[in-house]
Amino acid sequence: MSSKKRQAKLYQFDPMIYPRFLWVVTGGDYIDIKKWFLTYDGEEIEESDVSNLGGLTISVTFRQTQSLGILIWFPDIRLAKANWITHESTHGTLELFEQLGLRVDYRNQESVAYLAGWFAECIEFVKTGKVNALKLEKKTDESNN
């Protein structure tokens, strides 16, 4: 893997049936994450929370709109294979269910599987260039999906 930092790009998705967003960030580093997001509780994200990771999934607040949701960050999306996308999608699903106080167990596995698949599909859209990154020069309140 090259040590050169890749330009950060931000993608936003709206799951429609859940009152939260999914943000996928590719490239960049802590400074980019901090510029766009706060913790879910509105605090600053600590550098130790996002440093030296191959990927990250956390509950966040989007600074620009104060919207709540899930951030999945891939410093280099080219390295994201099916197992890694599945891994982060599972974390994202569990984070979102936790945010909304929804139960996760064998009795509601269909909703868990559906949401994890949706997360993975969004990441795949980013990886394959099927969606455009947000342009943050203007206020953005619409999703790319």
What is the predicted role of each segment?
Residues 89-105:
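Catalytic Zn2+-binding segment of zinc metalloproteases
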Residues 3-4, 60, 144:
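Compositionally biased regions
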Residues 134-145:
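Short acidic DE-rich linear segments
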Residues 79-80, 107:
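Short, surface-exposed coil-to-beta transition loops
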Residues 1-54:
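Non-catalytic terminal regions of proteins
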